[in-house]
């Protein structure tokens, strides 16, 4: 009896020791694929190595909206545009007219309201659920993919690492980023945006003597009281590769550490930029000086606001648009549209003989033109 009692007490003591090794983390999580219970410091709270495409974890967006930048792609859920092969997720561009016919782009009506839950249009803004093509405003000429964890996983504070290879091809726009689960401080950019990695697929896009295509990646924070007042120039960082050895040549690790004191970005464990919260993002953006009388949307939040809420993960391959590719940059063959053009998508499509060969769509299932993601991992602080 004494031996049994001793064993019970010993095992209970061991359990206390094991439990005491968990140092509670300031990280918070939510969602169907988020861990339950106490979050411990250093705990891995999300991981996908892409042994398969988990649709419960990654929701596909279905929209024509253009990402707020009048981009030229139609995001859809099909295995031509998103698939897993040999442990890698591919987000792949295809040509819309390959399935609809060329005439449909200038005369057809595309309605993407679906009857099944997974087929519903996810963003109706900017005619995102239905468009009618005309000779001057073609229906989105490219199909691509955008996936997100909005329902499955969101977190506040932690470290995220994504190993990815950016695509090669003119006017391709890969992005890995985070958006707020709830717009606690209002619509964009009042509730913030965290861009872990953005790049351009052009091999030889040059501005002011610098390759801003595949040899450059960027990380950015967006924040401000309204779209016309955005403090991102104070929190935008870029890193360039060695000339001739762009980020499209191999997989690279893109990571950030997000704490109650700030956000720091890394590429292959090398610092790309850091944002310390200081007295807050209102002061960082200088909004009181730039727009006197504007109300601070974060006045009732913490000093880290708007980056004191849970964010979810997004990965996508966009194409073109009227914001990200500067008109003043030089590119072999030129740029077929201007950012101020009222028919930018049409101009882009009409210039396809210039850019389409650079995508190499007929080689190796166009993997070179795809955003390739090896893994996504998130740890608690």
Residues covered by each model-derived region:
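Cleavable N-terminal signal peptides of Sec/SRP-targeted secreted and luminal proteins
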Residues: 2-20
